[in-house]
Amino acid sequence: MLQESIKKLVQYGIDMGLTPECERIYTTNLLLECMKEDEYIDPDCDLSNIILEDVLKELLDEAVNRGIIEDSVTHRDLFDTKLMNQLCPRPKQVIDDFNRIYDNHGPIAATDYFYKLSKASDYIRTYRVKKDLKWTCDTEYGTLDITINLSKPEKDPKAIAAAKNAKQSTYPKCQLCMENEGYAGRINHPARENHRIIPITINNSNWGFQYSPYVYYNEHCIVFNGEHTPMKIERATFVKLFDFIKLFPHYFLGSNADLPIVGGSILSHDHFQGGHYTFAMEKAPIIQEFTVKGYEDVKAGIVKWPLSVIRLQCKDETRLIDLATNILDKWRNYTDEEAYIFAETDGEPHNTITPIARKRGDYFELDPLESTCRHASLALAVVLQRRDW
């Protein structure tokens, strides 16, 4: 049974383009070592219609029986990641293949390759992602996507207790750091041995491009700073967003808000999220156009959306960045007590934005500039046109 499972897993790697045929024996021996097995007799078994989840379960059950791992979701996830890494190409090969495809066939072909690799390597556990609940709802603001994420494995009580008592480590500093690539993981940090990162340059600095293992939508990607540095919404944020969009114009890219009171992000590490998907907000129409003095070449308007959104469009992304920075600076310090908008209370700032960038035809687009306060886009549209600004 063990030898059949190993042969099937190696064949899966070959079929999916992870493992070259010439490395069949080499990969088989790597898996034998993982399973603490010295002997191997090539079994006669059906190698058609291999289901990865089933093969991994067979190997994990055997690893539990042999005392190699404990029988828990956490230990199984750590170990099957180790198994899958034996099939995967080294990081340099992935980078070289990505860049070659990008140069010869364009960005869409390159991201297609990388996304398929991330799924085939089981970094994205597609059989778990399928468990997520997804449906749409027609509203006055368009057809909204509603999802419930069920793909993150639940921690069992033993794993929770073990994580509490485990020795604390600061390596990697967080789950977004470059140092996660190839990391074996531990009881309180996921294994990332089958994880691969594409290095990119944005705003003249080193960043990483990867996919989210939980893919909330198609080609859900994460773009993160090569250094462990905090998130901050500023002019450089817009530059980084559009540098990425120029590299991958078929993707959108956005930043979560940089205030703890807003929540929903790892604020300790500068990063963005994006993907190849069209959300309802992108389709939402402009309900009121306006012009900002000095930026007449930038199209601006309020988006029909339940939250406060301003949409900016321009063929020259530098002009768009200039206006976005102007809006951000004014909004940070804007207070309107009658509208219950306060720049800060007790020294804690309240006003920030959630910028999302994309390319729409010949135009660069920043959509939205979403505030944390109600009716803010209308207020901004008015105050931006004041002569004293």
Swiss-Prot record:
Q: In which pathway does it act?
A: Carbohydrate metabolism; galactose metabolism
Name by which UniProt lists this protein: Galactose-1-phosphate uridylyltransferase
User: Which gene underlies this protein?
Assistant: galT
Q: Which PANTHER family match?
A: DUF4922 DOMAIN-CONTAINING PROTEIN, GALACTOSE-1-PHOSPHATE URIDYLYLTRANSFERASE
Q: Report if keyword Cytoplasm is assigned.
A: yes
Write out the GO MF terms.
UDP-glucose:hexose-1-phosphate uridylyltransferase activity
Any one GO cellular component localisation term in the record? cytoplasm
- The enzyme's E.C. designation: 2.7.7.12
Family, similarity comment:
Belongs to the galactose-1-phosphate uridylyltransferase type 2 family.
Keywords linked to the UniProt accession: Carbohydrate metabolism, Cytoplasm, Galactose metabolism, Nucleotidyltransferase, Transferase
Could you tell me the Gene Ontology terms of the biological process aspect for this record? galactose metabolic process
Q: Which domain of life is it from?
A: Bacteria
Swiss-Prot/TrEMBL catalytic activity: alpha-D-galactose 1-phosphate + UDP-alpha-D-glucose = alpha-D-glucose 1-phosphate + UDP-alpha-D-galactose
**Catalytic EC class:** transferase
Identify the main location: cytoplasm
Q: Which Pfam families match?
A: GalP_UDP_tr_C, GalP_UDP_transf
Subcellular location as annotated: Cytoplasm
UniProt keyword Glycoprotein present: no
List, alphabetically, the HAMAP family matched. GalP_UDP_trans
Give the species this sequence originates from: Butyrivibrio fibrisolvens
